[in-house]
Amino acid sequence: MLKKKKTEVYALGEHISMSADKARRVINQIRGRSYEETLMILELMPYRACYPILKLIYSAAANASYNMGSSEANLVISKAEVNGGTTVKKLKPRARGRSFPIKRSTCHITIVMKDISLDDEYVEMYSLKKTRWKKKSTAMPYRDMYNSGGLWDKK
């Protein structure tokens, strides 16, 4: 029986005090990118969600170097997901003995990094990738405007 070499490491951040939608806005920008490119993107983005995600990226890279002995140049973010966590509920005291509820949302962030030097499938897919660009047509068809009698006839 052949044992497959482990090529993925992950870092999990739970109960991060932030909305899941705000964290997803940043995660969608870094999914599928290399380690160095991700660090540059996160350091330049102006969102508050970048700092906890940056800490998770550092943690996943440290896990990869410690557990697999891989270098940071070979790491690619293969999976990044944000799930909603528990909602912290508090009461804010108001006038006349009343209180208003405050709901503080949390989220769970999972970062999975893959070492591309150990992964054979990634190397094969990278070599099969087409490098040609498709030429887009810049001419816009106006047949709908001409067939309908134009836009100026209607009041």
UniProtKB/Swiss-Prot annotation:
Subunit composition and interactions: Part of the 50S ribosomal subunit.
InterPro entries listed in its UniProt record: Ribosomal_uL22, Ribosomal_uL22_bac/chlpt-type, Ribosomal_uL22_bac/org-type, Ribosomal_uL22_CS, Ribosomal_uL22_sf
One GO cellular component term noted in the UniProt record for this chain: large ribosomal subunit
Protein purpose: This protein binds specifically to 23S rRNA. The globular domain of the protein is located near the polypeptide exit tunnel on the outside of the subunit, while an extended beta-hairpin is found that lines the wall of the exit tunnel in the center of the 70S ribosome.
Family named by the database record: Belongs to the universal ribosomal protein uL22 family.
Species of origin: Nicotiana tabacum
Annotated PANTHER family: CHLOROPLAST 50S RIBOSOMAL PROTEIN L22-RELATED, LARGE RIBOSOMAL SUBUNIT PROTEIN UL22M
Gene3D superfamilies in UniProt: Ribosomal protein L22/L17
Gene from which this protein is expressed: rpl22
Protein name, UniProt field: Large ribosomal subunit protein uL22c
GO biological process, one term: translation
